[in-house]
Amino acid sequence: AMCETARAMLVGDNLVGRVIARPFLGSNGAYTRTENRRDYAVEPVAETILDRFAQRGLQTVSIGKIEDIFCHRNVGLADHTKNNHDGIEATLKYLQGDEGSFIFTNLVDFDMLYGHRNDVEGYAKALEYFDARLPELIAAMREGDLMILTADHGCDPTYPGTDHTREYIPILALGPAWKGGAPLGTRTTFADIAATAVEYLTGEIWHNGTSFLN
């Protein structure tokens, strides 16, 4: 309720991009963050790729906190999973079904539980867990599917402090019909991923970024 009130107040000259509710349990000196995070964002001020996909009749599936980040606008079928395990399970379910043309998954544990908390061992174990599950995701892909693995920012658990860090993000793109081993180079903008998704699903040129589809 406090964050909802803050979101209603922080508009106009006092506008902030996002109010984040991060509930904790425990007592003084021994608090533990729960998985019941919610993000109260500002509605996007311009067209997003989710808007474009909706206009073209494509179904988006939003897994994790995606629905909150995009302020529930054209997020399609929203599955608000709370951790990496549930996010991977949901992604597998929708890959194997027929609900989505575009499956948009956020796995929050890397950032929330380990990066910001400087938990190197936990981060390593989370990476190992995802690596172990990745073959299942790849096996569930169909001919013509394209999977892009990336991050929205760095969050190095070994770096002093608890804020985001400034590494270049990784981009891995793969699919049954795609030849592997092609270097994508150092991209100039995060928007290249959006441009690639739009070209792949609609054949259209996105107004930001450059597609690396070819």
Regions inferred by a protein language model and the residue ranges of each:
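Feature captures the catalytic ectodomains and active-site-proximal regions of enzymes
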Residues: 1-214
